[in-house]
Amino acid sequence: MGSNYIVIEGLEGAGKTTARDVVVETLEQLGIRNMIFTREPGGTQLAEKLRSLVLDIRSVGDEVITDKAEVLMFYAARVQLVETVIKPALAQGVWVIGDRHDLSTQAYQGGGRGIDQTMLATLRDAVLGDFRPDLTLYLDVTPEVGLKRARARGDLDRIEQESFDFFNRTRARYLELAAQDSRIRTIDATQPLDAVMRDIRATVTKWVQEQAA
């Protein structure tokens, strides 16, 4: 399908929206303009309804969403987006810039929730097969910094209201996974914004040039 699926990952408040803008600007400077944007969960009618269910704290009233129900909703939304939007776009040579993908589930549910990692890997492989992003930019930020930024934006969703311990476990799993996969590039998002933007530009530029070589 070509090397044109880039995903941006990170904790709440890591700066994913700013990073997306920098990625787009960098790609355009490299002559790439045929792009679409996705977010997870979401991106299709079904996936957006699932997003509301899993993130809106009021969506199911007083009913507690179990950890396994949560992860299955994420995967239902993901496979719908991948099969109906992402794969068709990639097949047509369109670049896809994604706000989150499967790494989020491996980190949040595997790290934060403590769901068995073998089960998550099996579920991922059953649902997605060998489909993976070509490049993932992981914006690394401490929960203290990230949640301070997120809370400054206003209302928090169901997952954003989790404890610092939850986000520390999530971050630890992100870092562990990033160290295991060369397709994941870690960006220090605790730096001043100019430095973060510089690192993103440099990483994307180098990667695109490597793919073209």
Swiss-Prot record:
ATP binds at G10, L11, E12, G13, A14, G15, K16, T17. GO terms for molecular function: ATP binding; dTMP kinase activity. The keyword Kinase applies. Keywords: ATP-binding, Kinase, Nucleotide biosynthesis, Nucleotide-binding, Transferase. It catalyses: dTMP + ATP = dTDP + ADP. GO terms for biological process: dTDP biosynthetic process; dTTP biosynthetic process; dUDP biosynthetic process. The keyword Zinc-finger does not apply. Its EC number is 2.7.4.9. GO terms for cellular component: cytoplasm; cytosol. InterPro entries: P-loop_NTPase, Thymidylate_kin-like_dom, Thymidylate_kin_CS, Thymidylate_kinase. Pfam families: Thymidylate_kin. Phosphorylation of dTMP to form dTDP in both de novo and salvage pathways of dTTP synthesis. Belongs to the thymidylate kinase family. This is Thymidylate kinase.
